[in-house]
Amino acid sequence: MSILDKKALKFLEDYLNNAAPTGYESGGQKIWMNYLKPYVDEFITDVYGTAVGVINPEAKYKVVIEGHSDEISWYVNYITDNGLIYVIRNGGSDHQIAPSKWV
């Protein structure tokens, strides 16, 4: 028996199939916020791709559900005649993980 209902599975499928590389997080934010909408009273977003749902925002103590929605991404910059792929990174991924790696 799954602990995820159909709505949760649909959210997970939509979220995982959505491209949200660094700088283009808004699609992921929208999916996350639509899923949380029935459970929170307000949302806060920032320019870094964070979406926060707040329960009972006027209370002294609040419940906050937070998610950061970008993913590591690299762009193909060039492909050689021998099939070597040259990539450039997008965002803050570690540049030392890519050189001479099999893809």
Regions found by a protein language model. Give the residues of each.
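N-terminal hydrophobic/helix-forming segments and targeting peptides
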Residues: M1-V103
